[in-house]
Amino acid sequence: MKNKKTFSRRDFLKVGSTVGSGLVIGFHFPFGNKLFCAEKQNSFKPNAFIQVLPNDKILISIIKAEMGQGVWTSLPMLIAEEMEADWSKIEVSQSSESSFFGTGGSSSISGYGWKKMRQAGAIAKEMLVEAASMKWKVSPVECEARSSVIYHKRSGKKISFGAISDSAAKLKVPKKARLKDTKDFSIIGKDMLRTDSMAKVNGTAP
């Protein structure tokens, strides 16, 4: 497929670390055709975000418009898979960080989403796990994340993503994060209730 773009560390950015705001990671979701991109290539402007709130909610804001193709569900699923997040705690919204919105060419998943969103989720998880390991004074390899909770295998200690999110926000964004093997997927490939269904039924959809 043409116009696919590789990405580097500068494609991911820790947006803020205000106490009480949790962990916020911004990243740039590029567009398939450079001719229609209104933003300069050398200016990194986040247009998608992951925010882990202290109350355990995970807010995902994406630039791709939901036009019935299911991207408000499929793209967050990629993030949740790599984060080891509890799907019931995911909330999705339309990003308004850019005046240019790019939805088309069936590129949301195959073009950029598959690796981009997974990498964003993996980075968020790695930062949360590292923060928990520092709190417990153990190695990150001794910890694992499951359903929005981080566990220390030996001691039995556990802490939720939200409870450690402010600490994670103080850490540097890692250069890279390891992605899961496809055989270990627990969310991707499953039938999920669409995140936009209720809002469209009750008339609150944007």
Predicted regions and their residues:
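Cofactor-binding beta-sheet edge motifs in enzyme active sites
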Residues: 2-26, 36-206
